[in-house]
Design a protein with these regions (language model features):
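Fungal secretory targeting signals
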Residues: 1-21
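Primary mode marks residue(s) on the alpha4-beta5-alpha5 output face of response regulator receiver
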Residues: 20-67, 76-250
Length: 250
């Protein structure tokens, strides 16, 4: 179990039994080319997140890998979410049908859970497992190596909560920033990966611009794995490892 970590900087397996069909992008010749990535449907009996409006376009699909933070007032209380911390990796090219390195639909849907179950959280964790370093939580910026892929997944940025407690996505590799607010959320499908500690998957989210963003206006958190709290077994702070797919639009 990871102890809760709340970092302040100065300046958030799919039930894809039937994956959504691809949208084909017509080429200038009128012939279909690579499919346009389509947000996954929840398929778990819950209402869906709103679809992206027609006046925005997809900028990145990122894998977020880190921790969700909670606090408990006492053992009888419900855990209160108090932030998150994650490294973001650009997986747009891995979406099915995008190119020679693309994954199959099944591989894509299982990627967050597979990574969470097999790799170490890419943060500077304290030696005794009490969360991430308060001084330098993020390690050196580097791409993510996965045994099943011939090439590393490119680093894209960081996810954290700023000094005002606002969820922030700093895509510094692309020089883009989303200072976010929650517009909507739904429960993750029951079949979603529960994570290595079996806590369950955090909700899917739809996020918008809270002011101060540039290059990104909206984000979706989908295909979540792990990240739900351990419950209030004691008073204090707690953290749970998680992965998710973040779809960024502008």
């Amino acid at each position: 179990m990871l102890a809760r970590f709340f970092f302040v900087l100065p300046s958030a397996a799919l039930a894809l039994a039937s994956p959504p069909g691809h949208k084909l992008c017509p080429s200038q010749s009128g012939m279909p080319t690579k499919p346009t990535p389509v947000l996954p449907s929840n398929g778990g009996g819950h209402s869906e997140l709103p679809e992206p409006s027609e006046d925005v376009s997809l900028k990145h699909i990122a894998l977020g890998f880190g921790i969700q933070n909670y606090t408990c007032a006492d053992t009888a209380a419900s855990p209160t979410p108090v932030g998150a911390l994650a490294v973001l990796y650009d997986v747009t090219h891995l979406y099915p049908g995008q190119g020679h390195s693309s994954l199959t639909q099944d591989e894509w849907a299982s990627l967050p859970g597979d990574i969470l179950d097999t790799l170490k959280v890419p943060l500077n964790l304290n030696e005794k497992g009490t969360g991430a370093s308060l001084v330098k939580p993020f390690p050196k910026k580097r791409d993510l190596k996965i045994r099943s892929l011939s090439k590393k997944i490119p680093y894209l940025g960081h996810h954290y909560f700023n000094a005002a407690g606002v969820p922030t996505f700093d895509l510094d590799k692309a020089r883009q920033l989303l200072v976010a607010k929650k517009i909507g959320d739904i429960k993750a499908p029951a079949s979603s990966p529960a994570g290595p500690e079996g806590t369950g998957a955090v909700n899917w989210l739809f996020l918008g611009d809270a002011g101060g963003s540039h290059g990104i206006s909206y984000a979706y958190r989908v295909l979540t794995a792990g990240g739900a709290s351990h419950g209030c077994k004691a008073k204090g702070a707690d953290s749970t490892s998680y992965t998710a797919m973040y779809w960024f639009y502008n």
